[in-house]
Amino acid sequence: MRIFSTFVFHRRQQIFNLRQFQTTTILRNPISIAPIQIPMDATEQSLRQSLSEKSSSVEAQGNAVRALKASRAAKPEIDAAIEQLNKLKLEKSTVEKELQSIISSSGNGSLNREAFRKAVVNTLERRLFYIPSFKIYSGVAGLFDYGPPGCAIKSNVLSFWRQHFILEENMLEVDCPCVTPEVVLKASGHVDKFTDLMVKDEKTGTCYRADHLLKDYCTEKLEKDLTISAEKAAELKDVLAVMEDFSPEQLGAKIREYGITAPDTKNPLSDPYPFNLMFQTSIGPSGLIPGYMRPETAQGIFVNFKDLYYYNGKKLPFAAAQIGQAFRNEISPRQGLLRVREFTLAEIEHFVDPENKSHPKFSDVAKLEFLMFPREEQMSGQSAKKLCLGEAVAKGTVNNETLGYFIGRVYLFLTRLGIDKERLRFRQHLANEMAHYAADCWDAEIESSYGWIECVGIADRSAYDLRAHSDKSGTPLVAEEKFAEPKEVEKLVITPVKKELGLAFKGNQKNVVESLEAMNEEEAMEMKATLESKGEVEFYVCTLKKSVNIKKNMVSISKEKKKEHQRVFTPSVIEPSFGIGRIIYCLYEHCFSTRPSKAGDEQLNLFRFPPLVAPIKCTVFPLVQNQQFEEVAKVISKELASVGISHKIDITGTSIGKRYARTDELGVPFAITVDSDTSVTIRERDSKDQVRVTLKEAASVVSSVSEGKMTWQDVWATFPHHSSAAADE
């Protein structure tokens, strides 16, 4: 996706923003970064201004008190001055508290978030949801192992993803190798542009990601330094908004301006320079075939387009999907499961006619309302707001129906998993974030203790990827539309005069020729008009990263009329890309909760996972250690297994209340307690309510609720209630 990358994988859009330098554009200047003015909250701005004034007043009054004491002024005069100083200090303290409250409530405060995150992570590691890889050898940053409950949740998430997308939409699933030849990633742009900017400690050589150091500095200043002026705070927020687009020179200038040093040693830092994030390898024993561990799964789908198109009966639209591992050699991994060096992606490439991006099932999602964050709201400093998806498409906020359809389907997928819909938003990419070939891009962002985390990218990438691989491989990756009757069409013909271009540009001739031939019709006709009126034109060649002067004798541009029996075109691609690890971590945070024990002397942790994704659907507890009850538990276990319900029997002598608490902490939604040889109770985790059912009914009831055929409310209304006040004690 571009995604991602902030988490495990860097935002793919950022990758492809860089990719745009390889493609041509006409009569455009090289990309320049205009500051995006993000208006500061009016209350925060007012409080910062007030605090600055109060600080000045306190300082001035303090000087006045010292001057009175130095001049041996009368005691009443000194006392009055001290009283005024104390009054000013109290006013300053009040403003500081108000400002700190505003910062915390706006999501910038870190103390509560850090405490919550620590509680979640401690529970996850203690219950073996995940653990650092190779822990007995001190581990390696950015590598984690999923333990038994973590594996179960991941399996359930991917199973539902297949059902929700691949089966529902009749997608074609593929499984491509992780090891990818260099030529493939050269064509896609990854070899040249899949980079982050890195700095080194000039004395120890320790590496850091440059933008992270700048982000940490700005964030800490905004959160903890209440003395900075409103103007300085606005400047820092502007830097946070645009720093992903900083060039190495701009980023280095900011690091020097703010005096940022190595976090561990306070040593000076080197200038930022690009570091390619792919793991390089060689294929075969000769070492002559260079390759990389794939940074995304999408390229495997693109290079197989021709075969998939034929497999689908040469019909559009169709979608191909892939679930698999991807790799990113992070400079300084942090944020736990959110930024790792190996991760699971689930990606969809939906191929569609660029002249018809309607979707037959759009009406199924058109009435959905959820938080959306269009670029206009971002630019004006507003917040995300609830919009009707159908209206957003109709007004052009979302570019087309197919893109809108997948946004709606992603929303349904995430909320069914257990993501809180009030902490889920769809943010549209700003103009400076998008590659020039992209029609529209949205990210599904989930709020966590780390802030808003990009977990799914949904992008209309036009025809860029298929064209790039067509050009590099020489294999046309195109689709056809046959006409019932021949049509007379006008075709754009661009003919570079290679002799003249060779004389003018010598070794750069090939770059200029490719750029001229890659122009779209609008760009070509604009060039033609300028050449006819002025005889020359400035033409920006992305692969050279500079403009060149094109004269009238260097290129011929015309339109010819032809009769055609079919239309051959390169399909556009709508691409939803899912960072599975990020989604799962955000799910952990959204489902984590605490509640007091019966005695009220401690807080008990629990995960409120929906049955759909819970690692274990049900536990079976004999109420007491009793051979008869244990035999009944084994019978129920067999019945649960026969209907495909994951479960666990606990026949330890521990009290039933402690066993409930233990499984609540794993997020198990249901517990069957055996206290008879004819009937049992079923306990629901969140409410702690219990019903009594017969032995024969137990497995079918748990199965029906786990699979969504019934709700717990249905069960509660159907079966006798059971009360056991002591059970949870």
Curated annotation (Swiss-Prot):
Glycine binds at residues 296, 347, 575-577. GO terms for molecular function: ATP binding; ATP:ATP adenylyltransferase activity; glycine-tRNA ligase activity; protein dimerization activity. ATP binds at residues 328-330, 339-340, 454-455, 582. It catalyses: tRNA(Gly) + glycine + ATP = glycyl-tRNA(Gly) + AMP + diphosphate; 2 ATP + H(+) = P(1),P(4)-bis(5'-adenosyl) tetraphosphate + diphosphate. Keywords: Acetylation, Aminoacyl-tRNA synthetase, ATP-binding, Cytoplasm, Ligase, Mitochondrion, Nucleotide-binding, Protein biosynthesis, Transferase, Transit peptide. Its EC number is 6.1.1.14, 2.7.7.-. It comes from the Eukaryota. Residues 50-106 form the WHEP-TRS domain. CDD domains: GlyRS-like_core (cd00774), GlyRS_anticodon (cd00858). InterPro entries: aa-tRNA-synt_IIb, aa-tRNA-synth_II, aa-tRNA-synth_II/BPL/LPL, Anticodon-bd, Anticodon-bd_dom_sf, Gly-tRNA_synthase/POLG2, GlyRS-like_core, tRNA-synt_gly. It is found in: Mitochondrion; Cytoplasm, Cytosol. Residues 1-28 form a transit peptide. One of its GO terms (biological process) is glycyl-tRNA aminoacylation. GO terms for cellular component: chloroplast; cytosol; endosome; Golgi apparatus; mitochondrion; nucleus; trans-Golgi network. PROSITE patterns: AA_TRNA_LIGASE_II, WHEP_TRS_1, WHEP_TRS_2. SMART domains: WHEP-TRS. Catalyzes the ATP-dependent ligation of glycine to the 3'-end of its cognate tRNA, via the formation of an aminoacyl-adenylate intermediate (Gly-AMP). Also produces diadenosine tetraphosphate (Ap4A), a universal pleiotropic signaling molecule needed for cell regulation pathways, by direct condensation of 2 ATPs. Thereby, may play a special role in Ap4A homeostasis. Belongs to the class-II aminoacyl-tRNA synthetase family. Homodimer. This is Glycine--tRNA ligase, mitochondrial 1. It comes from Arabidopsis thaliana (Mouse-ear cress).
